[in-house]
Amino acid sequence: MGKKQKNKSEDSTKDDIDLDALAAEIEGAGAAKEQEPQKSKGKKKKEKKKQDFDEDDILKELEELSLEAQGIKADRETVAVKPTENNEEEFTSKDKKKKGQKGKKQSFDDNDSEELEDKDSKSKKTAKPKVEMYSGSDDDDDFNKLPKKAKGKAQKSNKKWDGSEEDEDNSKKIKERSRVNSSGESGDESDEFLQSRKGQKKNQKNKPGPNIESGNEDDDSSFKIKTVAQKKAEKKERERKKRDEEKAKLRKLKEKEESETGKKDQSKQKESQRKSEEETVKSKVTLDTGVIPASEEKAETPTAAEDDNEGDKKKKDKKKKKGEKEEKEKEKKKGPSKATVKAMQEALAKLKEEEERQKREEEERIKRLEELEAKRKEEERLEQEKRERKKQKEKERKERLKKEGKLLTKSQREARARAEATLKLLQAQGVEVPSKDSLPKKRPIYEDKKRKKIPQQLESKEVSESMELCAAVEVMEQGVPEKEETPPPVEPEEEEDTEDAGLDDWEAMASDEETEKVEGNTVHIEVKENPEEEEEEEEEEEEDEESEEEEEEEGESEGSEGDEEDEKVSDEKDSGKTLDKKPSKEMSSDSEYDSDDDRTKEERAYDKAKRRIEKRRLEHSKNVNTEKLRAPIICVLGHVDTGKTKILDKLRHTHVQDGEAGGITQQIGATNVPLEAINEQTKMIKNFGRENVRIPGMLIIDTPGHESFSNLRNRGSSLCDIAILVVDIMHGGEPQKMKPTNLPKPKKCPFMVALNKIDRLYDWKKSPDSDVAATLKKQKKNTKDEFEERAKAIIVEFAQQGLNAALFYENKDPRTFVSLVPTSAHTGDGMGSLIYLLVELTQTMLSKRLAHCEELRAQVMEVKALPGMGTTIDVILINGRLKEGDTIIVPGVEGPIVTQIRGLLLPPPMKELRVKNQYEKHKEVEAAQGVKILGKDLEKTLAGLPLLVAYKEDEIPVLKDELIHELKQTLNAIKLEEKGVYVQASTLGSLEALLEFLKTSEVPYAGINIGPVHKKDVMKASVMLEHDPQYAVILAFDVRIERDAQEMADSLGVRIFSAEIIYHLFDAFTKYRQDYKKQKQEKFKHIAVFPCKMKILPQYIFNSRDPIVMGVTVEAGQVKQGTPMCVPSKNFVDIGIVTSIEINHKQVDVAKKGQEVCVKIEPIPGESPKMFGRHFEATDILVSKISRQSIDALKDWFRDEMQKSDWQLIVELKKVFEII
């Protein structure tokens, strides 16, 4: 037994040392314990079990010998529910340990059996004791946290003290506490008691018999000191440590991320070097000084997991530690040697160097990172700007499409797609689907309604199919939600960037998913970034140089292959830069435009065609041949009746002017003058080198001269290369004579002046076969003087316009001085000189302008219906060439018309294009020519706008848009009124002329149209019958009126005025308006009451009653026959109606303000006659009795007869009569 006790005491000392080490660990690195609370608890439980087992053996041996065993058992029964049973037994038995050591062996077997019983009782316990065990372990922790020094002192004192006193005290305390528990005191006290018991048990376990008392004293003192505040403080301390640890972890994570973005390998190498160096330094330090660094001490402390495994090795470790300590103490006594000091110094120097090197590297790394960050920010900024530009372009594109009416909503796009699908289906089934343009314009056939049912059925089928497909896609999407690729964490930025087009982005994402999941069902779109590139290219082509345009075009021609390569490159970039934000942005931009791919196939084709057209135009502008000249377009301008057409007639030997309505040109005509005719006309000019003529001929355009046709003049002079301004030498200072000179100036068109009608000079002798300069010399002196005088006057007028002018034979500088050519269209004098000058000027000054160019430029001048040919268009071909069979796009009333050229007709040389001739048919026509084009659907063509040729089918929509833009500009200039006449003309030019004329004449127009008058035009005009019947009129200028339209107009009451001359039309309309007004005035003359105010002259009362005849002064307004009079001052008494007015015994209809007249006032029929002196006095003012109806009648039909003062009087009388 003695041996056993000795062994046990040794074990307890070892445990004591162990606990000391643990306490040190807790003080140094309490955080580690908190990190793994569960492990530590498990460890303590195991330790507790071992200790309980050792103590149970001893105590149960002592239990049999003790005298107070029975009393303790009774106590145990009272506290059966509590887990303090064993503890009480242990404490009571320990009190009697020394008394009963002899009977230990005898009762050893009994103790074993009791031990088994105790274990069974422990297993039967509920969860409550477990919780108390944990509480006990917490107290143990508290105990372990006590400082080392205090414990050491306590141990030393324990060796000296005797344990008997402590045993007695313990037994007393146990009894008292058991009584408290049995008497049912509060549970808190029992808990405290249990904790104290467990603490004491720990002390007993840690220290052998002689040290029991001091341990208990320590325990008691620890429990006394530990208040609630202390516990809270400790808890706070633990929480703080936890927070510190979390922060440290976060820091580590951040450092890791930074190191990952940087060069990982270098950082690892540095760390490994640093660690190795530190270890070497530490090992040297420990060897030299014997001082273990705190970090190593911490490392040496065993973890909770190691403690379980190292339970058996504790003894050996402790012995080793003791040995080490002794060695260290010896080394300390000796002190460090010189070698060690030197080694330490070297190590420190190395450390310093290493630290400096690391510092430098760290600074370099930070600098690099900063540079990278700056670079990244710059890239982000550029990317942002790029995105904003794209957004702006997209916005502009959408606005453009919106303006053009091409911006479709999702539903519209779907509808279009369905329609396209139905068309394809019809074509697949073999049904011929004619194109919109190729359909012949026919009268409506009622079979169409039946035909429409077939496509509707097919469309419904198509809709159902598309619905099924959509449903399938949705099912697939629902079925595979896990596979959705989560976008990188730059999503919020992406959302910010695409706020404007947010909906498009979501659509794009959906479309991306669909393409990934349902590749079989969906159409695979090869080109992702194409629409965006095309947008950019389109803008760049407008702004950048030609070379860039060519490169882009080449890139475009490569097609989908190049785009796929681009995609691969972008994919590689994405994989390379995972942490960079750029790829995600690229993806976002892709996704933005992916959604466009479905709906912008047409747009892509449109852009491609647009670029092709632009490139072709550029190439043509480069390949200009200055050696080969085209025929110049010569425009004849001038005032009406100056003889423009007559000059051309003389040139052509025709009589066009005689055939014109009223001898006035109202349309633009064109004449081709061949080279032979030029040579013929200029044969009398001596210095004219016929061999040097490079131009193939001339195209002369005749324009109307009247002011109302200024737009036609404008149109003509915009085409022409050089202009002839015809001025009548006999009439100076005409309003329009100098006006045409303003036309060529803004157009930068050179011009020359023909001083026409020189044959009107007195005693002029004609000589058409000689030069005009020679002819002038042959004239008499008086004729010469008159000519010079008139010519000088015209030169002065030009000078007033800011132009230098001189007679052509005196002009030495044609660039600065305008040449004046005296001509006579009647006799033919000066015509040769005129043509000679034209040829000279065009060849010398306009060679670049006349250089041959393949780029087509043509203008529609007139639209004419010819018998046997249908509707034809007269076109001035300025540049390029036209071939039979070309697809042309011409402007139309209801939009651009696409048609094929059926025939190209040219009038014979020297014949007017607009006059019916025996036309010559050509397969191809070169510029410059006046051509008549035959084709389908040309009825609604608008004159005055360009004609375009589409060489490929995809160019048609681009050219259509160009024409629509042109047409919008011209029609926006025409502003319609709510009330007004309906105007129809044969051409856009004449329509504009007529509208200009109506505007100056203050005639409002509510509707316009070009072409013959149909029933629909009459219907439109009839709307005015409801608003204002005087404007229910159609002014038809130079157009045919359909018979059914005339019949309908007659039945509805719409007047149609038709005339071939603009002035006749206007005269007819003004006459109609006047007649209509007279009718209305006659109708409303009894309702309309003119305002007047009269003062009675009391000395001129000729008859006071029935009728009242008296003299009055008109104070305001005007008195007319039939004006009802009343007296406002006498309760508005009606005195009668003015039947006659006399001035100086002469009867008049009206008496104005300030006149003294005699009036005869007859009583109102059916009323008693009023009397002067009874019903009204001489002091009373007489006024005309007005009403709302009378005021309206005056406004509508008698406005011309009213003056401003009359309207002011009406306002005054309205207040008197309280008229609203």
Swiss-Prot record:
It comes from the Eukaryota. Residues 663-667 are annotated as: G2. The keyword RNA-binding does not apply. The modification Phosphoserine is found at residues 66, 107, 113, 135, 137, 164, 171, 182-183, 186, 190, 214, 222, 438, 547, 557, 560, 588-589, 591, 595, 1168. It catalyses: GTP + H2O = GDP + phosphate + H(+). Gene3D superfamilies: P-loop containing nucleotide triphosphate hydrolases, Translation factors, Translation initiation factor IF- 2, domain 3. Belongs to the TRAFAC class translation factor GTPase superfamily. Classic translation factor GTPase family. IF-2 subfamily. Residues 20-32 have a biased composition (Low complexity). The modification Phosphothreonine is found at residues 301, 498. One of its GO terms (molecular function) is GTP binding. Residues 629-846 form the tr-type G domain. Interacts through its C-terminal domain (CTD) with the CTD of eIF1A (EIF1AX) or with the CTD of EIF5 (mutually exclusive) through a common binding site. Interacts with eIF1A (EIF1AX) from the location of the start codon by the 43S complex until the formation of the 80S complex. Interacts with ANXA5 in a calcium and phospholipid-dependent manner. Residues 702-705 are annotated as: G3. Its EC number is 3.6.5.3. The modification Phosphotyrosine is found at residue 134. GO terms for cellular component: mitochondrion. Its cofactor is a monovalent cation. GTP binds at residues 640-646, 663-665, 756-757, 759-760, 825-826. Binds 1 monovalent cation per monomer in the active site. Structural cofactor that stabilizes the GTP-bound 'on' state. May also act as a transition state stabilizer of the hydrolysis reaction. Residues 638-645 are annotated as: G1. PANTHER family: EUKARYOTIC TRANSLATION INITIATION FACTOR 5B, TRANSLATION INITIATION FACTOR IF-2-RELATED. Keywords: Cytoplasm, GTP-binding, Hydrolase, Initiation factor, Metal-binding, Nucleotide-binding, Phosphoprotein, Protein biosynthesis. Residues 109-118, 491-516, 531-569 have a biased composition (Acidic residues). Residues 95-105, 146-158 have a biased composition (Basic residues). This is Eukaryotic translation initiation factor 5B. Plays a role in translation initiation. Ribosome-dependent GTPase that promotes the joining of the 60S ribosomal subunit to the pre-initiation complex to form the 80S initiation complex with the initiator methionine-tRNA in the P-site base paired to the start codon. Together with eIF1A (EIF1AX), actively orients the initiator methionine-tRNA in a conformation that allows 60S ribosomal subunit joining to form the 80S initiation complex. Is released after formation of the 80S initiation complex.
